UniProtKB/Swiss-Prot annotation:
Keywords: Coiled coil
Gene from which this protein is expressed: Crocc2
InterPro entries associated with the record: Rootletin-like_CC
Bias (Low complexity) ranges: 67-82
Record's compositionally biased regions (Polar residues): 1-20, 406-421, 1349-1371
Coiled-coil region: 85-144, 426-1234, 1281-1315, 1412-1506, 1542-1576
Region (Disordered): 1-21, 39-92, 396-423, 1168-1213, 1338-1383, 1506-1551
Protein name: Ciliary rootlet coiled-coil protein 2
Length: 1638
């Protein structure tokens, strides 16, 4: 019954088991062959039974195993139990094979993970590279933008300088226009004078006619008529000549206006072209920069998209993990359904039911715990700990005894699990869940790191956006600067427009002058018509002369008028003499202009010397500026074109000037013709007198015409006043132009100051110097043109002197004409009886004139005394100024000594208080600035006083000349009156012809004797001149010898300069080598930074791993002990480092204090030297001005003495000439004595300068030795740097090897973990299927068997990383004994084998993790060693930089020595004209040099001490590096012991990084100090250039003094000859008058 009843139950159970197996198999196939499964899971194969069986897929093999186990009948199971054992063995073998396959699959998954990690690394590297490239592009764009802006600024400066040159050309053109206006004014004056002379002649004619009519002498009318006719012809010729001159002037004015217009148009076009080109260039550059910015934005957008893609990939990975988690949950549900089915199947047998119930309950509990763990895992990963607690509760429930169902169960107490037993499936599930939690935790950490990276990238993006904003702001600023530049260009255009407006004003003035000339022409035409009317009236008068004899009285009045006109002609002669005086004034003004031009030339030469010095400075940096020179060549070509245009303009102006000179010569020729016409007029006066007898009837008309002429003269005077007002306006415009020129000069000075500042700031602005050199070339060309103009002015002055001589000759000819008139008066001697009374009256007048002459002499003597008093006052003032200058110098010397003492005291007190010293230095600098301002104000005041004195002297000279001219004019008037009286006397004394002839013979004899005496005097004078010239030649030869000596000294200086240049070149080579070493060092730094970044990335990853392995490290107490010991050693090392750092900081502070002291002392010395030099310059200028004043006073005294001598007789004149020759010889002797004294002083100064030069050369040798020692130390330190770099490279290689090993270990670990997880999953699935199948087979047995320990639920344990749970406790294997002896050992052996394999696998994983940790520790150790090596390299680098500083200090000392040598040479050149007080200053400078030498020695000692102190910490660090290399060798075999050292070494690396940052700050400070020293050297070179300029100024002043002495001698000779000629002429004339009177 039982059997029959059991059959259908068995069928049902078989059917149910078959369905359950099908569902399990289907589930396994879905998990393995589903589309969500991986490729490796689908391709899993297992070998069949036997070794030669072909590999079959895992699901097929599982079906075979299950179907074979289920297809057997239960009886066969009872009959053949060994088959089941063999079948279990085969299944165990299959499981082992599956485990190997799963391990392979895990390895492949790890490889894929590694590929993903490598891809992430590659992406990060690409992002970093893109960031670097973008940064480089931004820097490059900023550099290019700054270069473009600098070029734009240089172009603007060039345009400003061009505008300055054009403004100078405009000033020259305006000056020439002023000269032309002056010439026009002189012509107008001559016209007015001619009209006045006409009126005067008419009056004279009227007077003569009235006199002759009163004397009833109609014969005089004929000569008067002739004179009137000649006057008319003369007027016509004068009119024609004036018209010709005016037409020529008009043509010249039109030409100049056209040229000016063309020049202005060219200037405007050039300025527009330059402005447009500059604006277009700037716009193009801005567009390019905007494009680059857009490109950068696009790149950043692409990088942002890549980062977003990376984030999306990470999110997809998270979603995949969540899907896998859901699949695990589904697998758990399917397992629950399978278990329920198994429960329904196993209700067939009682024993089996009891056992199955127990097993089902246990499995149910296990599944419940697994479900709770999975649900907690699915709900929240943070509930992992609670799930583990529930699992433990489940384990406790498993360990509790099950409920009893039957008495059989009570009889078998062995069914209850032992308290130490735990289900292996639960263990596997817990381990899988823990691993999954670990994985999830790792993924979360990676997500957090990726988010942090994304945040960092966002921050970088924000930083780059800020940089973009700053760059945009910079672009806006640059655009603003561009607008400012455009505004400046518009201002320049406005200036050009103003110049054009001034040109238009000049053209309008020219047109006004042309209108006035046309008006004058119209008036001249009116006068011609009036003269024609007069001729007609004269013809009518001739006809009516016979009928109108009654009007003789009116004719007499007419003769009086003619006499008045004669007097007017004499007045015209006086006016001509006044014109001569005006020409003399112009000559004086031209001389003043020449002197001003010479001063300008001197200034230009000084500027040239200063620019030469700047060029000498710039030559050292030309290697860096060759690229800029190539860019500036195009601009130079444009400037050359503009210069060529300007040269063409200047040539045109010179041609215009030549035409003006030609016009002036033509006017002079016309003036000569006018004078000849005047002679003709005087000859034709007789004819005019005859004609005037016939003009008696038309006297009323003539008077009316005279009134009209007077009105016209008034109009002309008004026009002249108008022209004078215009001249005043032009003078005001000239003053405005001068003010503009002053502003331009101020701008030029400001630009020069800016140039000096730019030289001090950076060598990057040397292109401005090159442009200044181009401008210097233009200035030299302008100077050549100015010299040509000066020569032309000199020629003009010579022409003026020639004209003066011609005027004198014309005056003599006029006197001859007067004599001829006197001869004509001999025909009228018939009237002698009537004119005896007149002769007596003439004698009375003569006596009165003699009285007046005596009065004039007394007035002249009074003026001479006044002048002498004035000269004495001037001399006293000069002496007072000299005394004040000497007192000021003495005060400055005292102040200098006091300042030196105070500086010494401050040097002693510097160690106590640095702040007080800085405040004192600031106060001292302010005082020095105030002193400089005061000295500048005093100098300006002195210059103003000197200019006032010069103006007063010039005004006094002009007044004297004017007074002399007035006296001469008075004398000429008296002469004319006397000639009139003599003519009357000759008319009255016709009887005394014979006596007059005898007197004439006597006069001729006296003339011959006087001429002989004059010839002898001339011979003597020529001999004196020849002797003077010989002496001058000897002096010139001596001066040439002195110049030769100077040239030799210059050659020596040039040789020294060449040596210095060689030294500079060597220094430049050394600097280049240092720069190359710095570049290599920077490359190493970049490589170290890259390695450091990679290390930091790896350290971050390893930190994550360490965080996951903290629980394993907690069990290692030995590592903690080692960590404590390492901490102690680290603290000791940190204390040592702190002590070393404090010592280094103290040494650096001391060195810095010493350097600041030395720098302040050097600044004080430079300021004092500059002050002394300025004072010396002021003294020299005052002495030169005093000498000039003395020369001028001596010239004035000589002129006064000459005037006094002219009043004496010829014999006294000869004696005075001899006395003057003796005085000249005495002066010559005095000059020779002074020259000898100066030579002695020069010899003394040269000897002292040579001694000082020797001292400075010794100083230079010492500095060169120090430099050689420093170079040797530098070479040694460079070797150490190379060794350190080699060590760093070796460490880097070992670090790379360790990193690669770490990567390999990580890959292996990941593979092992993946393989373990897959194997556990597969084992769980297989074990569940086997347990279900074997349970069904055991259900048919009589006695229960011990079930295997299944590991169900592995399907839900997909690999997912989460937080680590506490370590699971190891339990003993669950052994369930059964009463049936069915060889349980085989099954136990199989389960133990699986457990052992799992344990081995876990042990392997633990060992792999330990190896990974050890490799991380090794990497950390290697990174710390590499950081230490880098620190060592940085310290060596700091040592190199310190040596560079020492070398720079040595170079600075050498430069100081060079500057001192150059200052000695300049002092040698300057002291050639100085006085004895310069010797004391020289001694002071020698003392200062000795002090400098001591200071340099002290500085060298301090630097050596600093070097020794800095070498000590470097040696200690080297020892430390050696000590650290030993543990580096010991790290590899003892890797497991050094885990705790990693943290300590990290802390040490952080401290070393802070120290590195501090050292970098010190390096930046040292670089700033290097820049400051270079600026100081540049300042010294500028001072040297200034001294050279002063030297050349002194040489030029010597040459100017010689020229002025020669010119004064020539002027004295010319004045003596002229005075002798005048006196001889006066004596001859007086004798002739006496003869005529007798």
């Amino acid at each position: 019954m039982s059997s029959t009843s059991s059959n259908p139950d068995d069928g049902d159970t078989t059917e149910q088991s078959q369905l359950g197996l099908d569902t399990v198999i289907k589930k396994l196939e879905d998990t393995i062959l589903s589309p969500m499964a991986r490729r490796e899971d689908r391709a899993l194969t297992v070998r069949g039974e036997g070794q030669r069986a072909s590999p079959t897929p895992v699901p097929a093999r599982i079906r075979e195993i299950v179907s074979s186990s289920l297809g057997e009948e239960p009886l066969s199971g009872l009959r053949e139990p060994p088959a089941t054992t063999s079948h279990a063995r085969e299944e165990s073998e299959l499981l082992q094979e599956e485990l190997t396959r799963l391990e392979d699959l895990l390895a492949q998954a790890d490889a894929e993970r590694e590929e993903l990690a490598s891809r992430c690394h590659m992406v990060s590297q690409r992002l970093q590279a893109r960031l670097d490239t973008t940064e480089a592009r931004l820097r490059k764009s900023e550099l290019e933008h700054s270069m473009d802006l600098e070029e734009a600024l240089s172009r603007l400066e060039a345009s400003q300088q061009r505008s300055m040159g054009l403004s100078q050309v405009n000033t020259l053109l305006r000056q020439q226009l002023e000269h032309m206006q002056k010439a026009n004014d002189t012509l107008a004056r001559e016209l007015t004078r001619a009209t006045h002379s006409l009126v005067h002649l008419q009056r004279k004619l009227e007077l003569q006619e009235s006199q002759r009519l009163s004397l009833r002498q109609p014969r005089d009318i004929l000569p008067l008529w002739r004179q009137a006719k000649a006057l008319q012809t003369h007027l016509a010729e004068l009119r024609a000549s004036t018209e010709r001159g005016l037409t020529d002037v008009q043509a010249d004015m039109t030409r100049t206006a056209q040229r000016l217009h063309m020049a202005c148009l060219n200037l405007d076009s050039h300025l527009r072209l330059t402005a447009s080109s500059m604006t277009s260039d700037l716009e193009q550059r801005l567009r390019e920069q905007a494009r680059e910015m857009l490109q950068l934005q696009g790149q950043w957008a692409a990088e942002k998209v890549a980062l977003q893609a990376r984030l999306s990939e990470q999110t997809l990975l998270v979603e995949k993990l969540s899907v896998q988690k859901e699949q695990g949950e589904r697998a758990i549900l399917t397992l629950k359904s399978d278990i329920q089915r198994l429960k329904s199947r196993r209700s067939g047998g009682q024993l089996a039911v009891d056992e199955l119930r127990d097993e089902v309950e246990s499995l149910h509990h296990v599944l419940a715990s697994i479900k709770e763990v999975a649900q907690s895992d699915a709900m929240c990963p943070e509930l992992a700990w609670s799930s583990s607690i529930e699992v433990r509760e489940a384990q406790a429930r498993l360990r509790s005894p099950p409920r009893s169902v039957s008495p059989h169960q009570r009889m078998s107490p062995a069914r209850t699990s032992s308290p130490t037993s735990l289900h292996p499936a639960l263990q596997a599930v817990q381990a899988a869940i823990e691993r999954r939690q670990q994985r999830e935790q790792e993924l979360r950490l990676r997500l957090e790191s990726s988010q942090e990276e994304a945040a960092g990238l966002r921050e970088q993006l924000s930083g780059y956006r800020q940089e973009l904003r700053t760059s945009q702001r910079l672009l806006q600023d640059r655009a603003q600067e561009h607008e400012d530049l455009l505004g400046q260009l518009e201002a320049q255009r406005q200036e050009a427009q103003l110049s054009q407006a001034s040109v238009h004003l000049l053209e309008r003035e020219k047109e006004a002058l042309e209108t006035t000339m046309e008006e004058l022409r119209a008036k001249a035409d009116i006068r011609e018509a009036e003269t024609q009317k007069l001729e007609v009236t004269n013809a009518e008068l001739r006809r009516s002369l016979l009928l109108r004899a009654e009007q003789k009285a009116e004719l007499a009045q007419q003769s009086e008028r003619s006499l008045r006109e004669l007097e007017a002609s004499q007045g015209r002669v006086e006016q001509l003499e006044e014109k001569v005086s005006g020409l003399r004034k112009e000559l004086a003004t031209s001389r003043e202009a020449l002197s001003s031009m010479q001063l300008q030339r001197d200034i230009l030469e000084t500027e040239k010397e200063s620019l030469h010095g700047a060029l000498a400075q710039a030559e050292s940096g030309n290697a860096d500026l060759e690229l800029l020179v190539t860019r500036l060549k195009a601009e130079g070509m444009e400037q050359q074109d503009s210069l060529a245009k300007m040269a063409a303009l200047l040539e045109g102006l010179s041609q215009d000037k030549g035409t003006l000179n030609h016009l002036a010569l033509q006017l002079e020729q016309e003036r000569d013709q006018l004078r000849e016409q005047q002679k003709m007029l005087q000859q034709e006066q007789a004819g005019m007198r005859e004609q005037l007898t016939q003009t008696g009837q038309q006297l009323g008309l003539i008077r009316a015409e005279r009134r009209s002429l007077k009105e016209t003269c008034g109009h002309l005077e008004q026009k002249q006043d108008h022209l004078e007002k215009q001249v005043v306006l032009l003078g005001q415009e000239n003053a405005q132009l001068r003010e503009q020129v002053g502003q331009v000069t101020n701008k030029k000075q400001a630009l020069e100051k800016q140039l000096a500042q730019s030289l001090q700031d950076q060598e990057a602005q040397m292109d401005i110097l090159q442009e200044a050199l181009h401008e210097k070339n233009t200035l030299s060309e302008e100077r050549a043109q100015l010299l040509a103009k000066q020569e032309a002015l000199e020629r003009h002055s010579e022409l003026v002197t020639k004209e003066a001589a011609d005027l004198r000759a014309e005056r003599n000819s006029l006197e001859n004409s007067l004599f001829e008139a006197q001869r004509l008066t001999t025909q009228l001697q018939t009237q002698q009886e009537q004119l005896e009374g007149k002769a007596e009256a003439a004698q009375l007048a003569r006596r009165a004139l003699q009285v007046e002459i005596e009065r004039l002499k007394s007035d002249w003597e009074v003026r001479e005394t006044k002048l002498q008093l004035h000269l004495g006052q001037l001399q006293q003032q000069a002496a007072q100024q000299e005394q004040e200058a000497q007192l000021a110098l003495e005060r400055q010397e005292l102040a200098h000594t006091e300042d030196l003492a105070r500086l010494h005291r401050e040097k002693d007190t510097l160690s106590l208080s640095l702040a007080e010293e800085k405040e004192a230095a600031a106060r001292w600098m302010e005082q020095q600035k105030e002193l400089l301002t005061r000295s500048a104000a005093d100098r300006e005041a002195l210059q103003g006083e000197i200019q006032n004195l010069k103006q007063e002297r010039d005004e006094s000279l002009l007044q004297l000349e004017h007074e002399m001219q007035q006296a001469l004019s008075l004398k000429d008037a008296e002469k004319s009156l006397l000639s009139k009286e003599l003519s009357g006397a000759h008319r009255e004394l016709e009887r005394a012809r014979q006596e007059a002839q005898n007197q004439q013979v006597q006069a001729e004899a006296t003339v011959t004797t006087m001429t002989k005496e004059l010839r002898t005097l001339q011979v003597q004078f020529e001999e004196a001149i020849s002797t003077h010239q010989r002496e001058a030649d000897t002096l010139r030869e001596k001066l040439r010898e002195i110049a030769a000596e100077r040239s030799s000294v210059r050659r020596e200086a040039e040789e020294l300069q060449a040596q210095l240049n060689v030294a500079h070149e060597r220094l430049a080579e050394l600097r280049q080598e240092l720069q190359a070493s710095e570049e290599s060092r920077e490359g190493l730094q970049r490589e170290a930074l890259g390695a450091r970044r990679a290390l930091e990335d790896e350290v971050q990853e390893k930190d994550v791993l360490q965080h996951s392995n903290t629980e394993l490290r907690a069990s290692i107490h030995r590592a903690e002990q080692e960590k404590a010991s390492l901490k102690r050693s680290k603290e000791e090392q940190e204390q040592k480092l702190l002590l070393l750092q404090e010592a280094q900081v103290a040494a650096q502070k001391e060195a810095y204090e010493l350097r600041t002291r030395l720098q302040e002392l050097e600044r004080a010395q430079r300021d004092t030297r500059r002050k002394l030099q300025e004072r010396h310059r002021q003294v020299r200028t005052l002495e030169a001005e005093n000498q000039r004043k003395r020369q001028e006073v001596s010239d004035l005294q000589a002129q006064v003495s000459r005037d006094a001598q002219h009043r004496q007789k010829n014999l006294q004149e000869s004696l005075e000439l001899q006395r003057q020759v003796a005085e000249a010889q005495a002066a010559h002797d005095g000059v020779q004595k002074e020259v000898l004294g100066l030579r002695q002083k020069l010899a003394e100064v040269e000897a002292s300068g040579e001694t000082r030069a020797k001292q400075l050369e010794g100083h230079l040798c010492e500095s060169q030795r120090a430099e050689q020692t420093l170079q040797a130390e530098l070479c040694r330190i460079t070797r150490k740097l190379q060794e350190a770099s080699n060590q760093a490279d070796s460490l880097q290689r070992s670090l790379d090897n360790a990193c690669s090993r770490v990567h390999v270990l990580e890959q292996e670990l990941a593979k092992a973990e993946g393989a373990r997880c897959n194997a556990e999953a597969q084992l769980g699935r297989l074990w569940s299927t086997l347990c279900s199948g074997l349970g069904q087979s055991r259900n048919l047995l009589a006695s229960p068997k011990r079930p295997h320990s299944p590991t169900t639920g592995s399907s839900q344990t997909r690999p997912g990383r989460q937080r680590t749970s506490p370590p699971t406790r190891s339990y003993s294997p669950a052994r369930w004994p059964s009463p049936v002896p069915v060889d349980p050992k085989s099954e136990v052996i199989d389960v133990a084998f699986v457990r052992d394999a799992l344990r081995d696998l876990v042990q392997g994983l633990l060992e792999a993790q330990q190896e990974r940790d050890n490799s991380g520790i090794q990497v950390a150790n290697l990174s710390s060693q590499l950081s230490e090596a880098e620190r060592e390299r940085l310290r060596l680098q700091s040592r190199v930089e310190q040596l560079q500083r020492d070398l720079a200090d040595a170079e600075e000392g050498q430069r100081r020595a060079e500057s001192a040598l150059q200052s000695a040479q300049a002092a040698r050149a300057l002291q050639k004209e100085a006085l004895q007080r310069l010797e004391t200053e020289h001694l002071a400078s020698a003392r200062a040099a000795g002090q400098e030498r001591r200071r340099l020695q002290e500085q060298v000692d301090t630097l050596r001490q600093a070097l020794e102190e800095s070498s000590r910490p470097s040696q200690s660090l080297a020892d430390k590096g050696r000590l650290l290399e030993q543990p580096l060798q010991q790290v590899l075999p003892h890797s497991r012991r050094d885990r705790a050292e990693r943290r300590a070494l990290r802390e040490q690396t952080t401290s070393l990084r802070t120290e590195r940052a501090r050292l970098q700050g010190e390096l930046a400070a040292l670089r700033t100090r290097l820049i400051q020293t270079e600026q100081e050297t540049l300042k010294k070179e500028e001072d040297r250039a200034m001294l050279g300029a002063k030297k050349e100024l002194l040489l030029q002043s010597l040459s100017h003094l010689h020229q002025e002495v020669d010119g004064a001698l020539r002027q004295s000779q010319q004045l003596q000859v002229a005075s002798l000629k005048k006196r001889l002429d006066k004596e001859v004339w007086q004798r002739q008058q006496q003869a005529h009177s007798d």
